[in-house]
Amino acid sequence: MSSNFKFPKVSVLIPCFNSETFLSECLTSLQKQTLQEIEFICINDGSMDSTQLIIEKFHKLDNRFILINKNNSGYGDSLNLGLDTAKGEFIGIVEPDDFVEPDMFALLYEMAVQYNLDVARCSYFYHSKYGDTEQKWPSVPKNVVVNPIECISVFKQGPSVWANLYKNSWLQRNKLRFLTTPGASYQDTSFTFKAYFCARKFMMTDHCLLHYRIDNEKSSVHDKKKIYCVIDEWNEIYNFVFSKQIQDIPLIEKLAELQHRTYLWNLGRLDHEGKKKFIKEWHLEAKYRRRTKRTHLLKLSLLHFIIEGMILYCPNVLMLYNKELAIVRILKKLAN
């Protein structure tokens, strides 16, 4: 297929690093999009497998696929390069081990244009060899325009940048970019927070349009060595929020709770030694924020104080629990 448009309606960024296992399935699903005015920017981050050859094959058949080769510098740097390259009115991101429904970008684009959205979002499936499970985040309003700052449930979703469609001009105006720490993971955490913080018009559809693969052993979420990446992301979030000098919005009151949701999730995926290392760093961070009064603007919840107290005084108890829900259940009992 040959593109006959100068400026695409949507640019889709596909950050790739040693992605050969599922990449063809991913790119095939993109090629089948019902939206024709679309470009697919594949950023090859120094892959050492057949990733580049697979992308080149798709490019020969369909010049809407664009290959960018670069030395390995990480996920965030790859996506920033994609953002700088994209010509589309809106920008989407698809991970190379996921795949999408044929009408995903047509539906999100139509929704974004109709309601003049900064961010349009879809529900999605958790995908594994056993099948698909719908993930619709019931606490988030569907098919209605909201301001995320006035609807905190938007922030409580997983980062999942790949379920969103972003207005390109809005991204550029707000100078939204990913952290570029080489070798890091979860660099969508701070980006997603900043995007929702800056957005004034957000809408989520209840249509599940993307299949998020949860059983890829190569996924960074399973990398036990990347213990502290979420801390770097949350340092970026705190720096961003305090730079805005905003003190009177509900989100500020919830900031610590949102942080601890992320930390508890990270704790749950680590092995025993990783838990000990992470809790120690969490402890040091809590002491730093108290000492420097970086949390003086936050009306911290009781749950926050309980969690912080456990980190300070009884981390061994916290290490017994691997799942966020189990931890929260225990803490609520202690609070009563």
Locate the predicted segments by residue.
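Donor-binding/catalytic cores of nucleotide-activated saccharide
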Residues: 75, 79, 96-203, 210-227
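A conserved acidic beta->alpha catalytic loop
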Residues: 44-53, 73, 95
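Short aromatic/hydrophobic "clamp" motif used to bind/position activated sugar donors
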Residues: 91
